[in-house]
Regions:
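Carboxylate-rich, polar loop motifs that coordinate divalent cations or form catalytic acidic clusters
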Residues: 1-281
Length: 281
């Protein structure tokens, strides 16, 4: 099974840190967290924090943890479908926490009604989730209506939330895709879907005509993608696209199809703390 490493990198100057001290509180098993291996954190509309771990879903109210585990099939209690989780994502519109599991599909927890919805592969339904191994979840540009779901080896899925049906984006439907192994994806307002592959570089899929641009690291080109293992893609408030890889951070220029790269430099106190970037917010 693949190994996940979730890390948060805070890029702060020494002057800023000196002027603004931070109090860091450790939250672990001793404080009620179900497992110290945390892969993802999100915050819901009510301000609560949710943690995806290797052993269940955790909600933190600022004082204590509430843990959600998979119930036995014989139980009538609704629950998550697997305890080994990859990601949690707070829906920006609905009171829902979306939960990506490692081998048990996609779950949705409505924290107002305290109910679960489950999306799993069904061989008899061609519009069901194509695989139960989900790596990443994010909203489409039409927040609250659609969801992009990345899978480890079967490409990208688009979920129509109203119908519960999935549209598949893989080599069968988009032959130009270089790989179906995906870590992450982000949709831009111009109809482009940015896809981060597992050791396969970056793809930009036009949702209008299904054409694909593909980028990989070129050791002879300092303005190429810094690494081929693309772990996270972030669109900032100015529309800039940031790419996190195992070999550094890059800012993508859509006009020139080039990258400005930011690597770890031990001699630069104002640079990135590490070249391994796996999560950005």
């Amino acid at each position: 099974m693949k190994t996940y490493i979730a890390a948060f990198f805070l890029l702060l100057s020494a002057t800023f840190v000196a002027a603004h001290p931070y109090l860091i509180q450790r939250l672990g098993i001793e404080q009620g967290l179900s497992n110290n291996y945390v892969l993802s954190i999100t915050q819901d509309k009510q301000g609560f924090l949710w943690f995806a771990t290797e052993e269940g879903l955790n909600k933190f109210d600022g004082t204590r943890f509430i843990t959600y585990y998979k119930e036995e099939q014989s139980s009538s209690v609704q629950s998550i479908t697997g305890n080994e989780l990859n990601e949690v994502y707070a829906d920006p519109v609905q009171p829902v926490i979306w939960i990506a599991t490692q081998r048990a599909g996609l779950n949705a927890y409505n924290y107002e009604t305290q109910s679960f919805s489950v999306y799993q592969y069904n061989p008899e339904d061609p519009q069901s989730l194509i695989t139960n191994d989900v790596t990443h979840i994010t909203s489409s540009v039409q927040a609250g209506k659609g969801l992009w779901v990345c899978t480890y080896y079967r490409g990208i899925e688009y979920l129509d939330i109203a119908t519960g049906k999935f549209t598949h984006y893989n080599k069968s439907t988009v032959p130009a895709l270089p790989s179906e192994q995906t870590w992450t994806a982000t949709e831009a307002e111009d109809g482009k879907l940015y896809i981060g592959h597992v050791e396969g570089g970056l793809s930009i899929l036009s949702l209008n005509d299904k054409s694909v641009k593909h980028f990989v690291h070129d050791p002879q080109n300092p303005n190429s993608l810094p690494g081929n293992d693309v772990r996270c893609i972030y669109k900032d408030t100015n529309g800039n696209i940031w790419i996190g890889t195992s070999k550094g951070l890059a800012l993508f220029n859509a006009n020139t199809d080039t990258f400005t790269n930011f690597h770890n430099n031990p001699g630069n106190n104002h640079g990135a703390l590490s070249s391994y970037i796996s999560v950005s917010y």
